[in-house]
Design a protein with these regions (language model features):
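Cysteine-cluster motifs in flexible loop/terminal segments that predominantly coordinate metals
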Residues: 106-153
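Generic alpha-helical secondary structure signal
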Residues: 5, 9-13, 85-88, 94-98, ...
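Iron-sulfur (Fe-S) cluster-binding modules
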Residues: 154-158
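Radical SAM enzyme [4Fe-4S]-AdoMet core and its adjacent flexible, acidic
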Residues: 1-85
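Residues embedded in well-ordered secondary-structure elements
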Residues: 46-48, 52, 101-104, 132
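Residues that form generic nucleotide/phosphate-binding pockets
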Residues: 14-17, 21, 90-93, 103, ...
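Membrane-interface junctions of multi-pass transporters
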Residues: 72-118, 122
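Residue-level detector of family-conserved "landmark" positions at structurally sensitive sites
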Residues: 31, 101, 125-126
């Protein structure tokens, strides 16, 4: 059905059926956490890495400062505006930025806390998690659902 989300199992099955198969003229990108990726995929193209959330700051087109582009939809994650705040002071002293640098990945919740990829994945997209739950460190929602349903790879837990 158009517009409906795939179930976790459907998405994992599709990923496994296509795997690393990309043609010469195209590449298939799956938005799937590294815990579900094959070793060859992880080794071959550097997948499994975070967006760099601990080392970035977002400046939106109106000058607003946020942790990333999520500030466009989550006003609670706006940290100031370049017209009134220096990027340096936001980077050094903002409580949200400080929390991200200090608490990721150690205070991630859910299955992320036990995942062998937590130091590189860092909860995949904490902005998306915030958008859905109101909490930055809740852990990746896809992984959490997969774990609850018994689809999270046990071999990726520590």
């Amino acid at each position: 059905m158009t517009g409906e989300r795939l179930s976790v199992k459907e998405f994992i099955d599709i990923y496994h059926s296509f795997g690393d198969r990309s043609g010469d003229d195209f590449r298939i990108l799956f938005d799937i956490p590294p815990a579900f990726q094959s070793v060859s995929t992880l080794a071959g193209n550097g997948s499994g890495k975070t967006c760099g959330i601990r080392n970035i700051i977002g400046v939106l087109s109106n000058g607003d400062i946020s942790i990333c582009g999520i500030g466009n939809v989550e006003k609670e994650l706006l940290l100031g505006n370049v017209r009134t705040h220096s990027l340096e002071s936001v980077w050094k002293f903002d409580e949200t930025i400080r929390m991200i640098r200090e608490d990721l990945p150690g205070k991630l919740g859910g299955v992320c806390r036990r995942c062998m990829f937590k130091k590189s994945c860092m909860g995949r997209c904490i902005a998306h998690t915030y958008h859905r739950t109101g909490k930055l460190l809740d852990g990746d929602l896809f992984c959490g659902e997969a774990y609850r349903l018994g689809f999270f790879p046990e071999s990726r837990l520590i």
